[in-house]
């Protein structure tokens, strides 16, 4: 992965470590910021993430849908209070609309897209930060542009879903989007489940078995394990889960009854994957007072 100047800058801001050390850390960790912070900590170059208190883990998921095109954008703020601010919300909506119209493929491309004001997304972001006094981050972008049925669903501004369905109708596609929002399946179909996941689950199931069960004939043991794995696969695939709008049927049964096929989906939830910092104000006050 190319180590860009923006990645080096972000790591420097978070750790206070020199440019060359940051570049080396990013190179060692394939450009992953969080892994690079941990690498620097293990190397003794930094005791903690200096920008930890400025992590933008709140925010808004915005969906814009126009026929067979739809985009999903996550815009982060530091606090839930700012996530409800009118300036923040206006920025989030403008960014999502611009992403749809411009056809931006990723966040890096989106930064350079111009908004109706004439300023780029990145320039406007800087202005919003100056106005509200919190870090604001355009974190993720997903899009679907297809001749198939495309549905978009957002729940409370915190969860957003895009779904592409071949066949069926718009109502079915929207129902599937609502299901994905509620159940968060990691995979679409059985064929999408990774071999690594299956192997890991097999190891876990074997470790949970008693020595008596493990001593059973290989063919019987394989049937027991396969049964457990099949149950797990149903739980982690969209097609295997009971349909939230009709739990008596699986999603696969509902989709096939409509002569349809779910091509894929995208789901985002505000702040997922971001480690939130819990402040210990009592310890901080004692430290500043020289009592600890």
Swiss-Prot record:
Its main location: cytoplasm. Transmembrane segments: none annotated. The keyword Cytoplasm applies. Gene3D superfamilies: 1.10.286.20, DNA helicase RuvA subunit, C-terminal domain (1.10.8.10), Elongation factor Ts, dimerisation domain (3.30.479.20). SUPFAM superfamilies: Elongation factor Ts (EF-Ts), dimerisation domain, UBA-like. It is found in: Cytoplasm. Residues 79-82 are annotated as: Involved in Mg(2+) ion dislocation from EF-Tu. Pfam families: EF_TS (PF00889). GO terms for cellular component: cytoplasm. The keyword Repressor does not apply. GO terms for molecular function: translation elongation factor activity. Keywords: Cytoplasm, Elongation factor, Protein biosynthesis. InterPro entries: EF-Ts_dimer_sf, Transl_elong_EFTs/EF1B, Transl_elong_EFTs/EF1B_dimer, Transl_elong_Ts_CS, UBA-like_sf. Associates with the EF-Tu.GDP complex and induces the exchange of GDP to GTP. It remains bound to the aminoacyl-tRNA.EF-Tu.GTP complex up to the GTP hydrolysis stage on the ribosome. Belongs to the EF-Ts family. This is Elongation factor Ts. The gene is tsf.
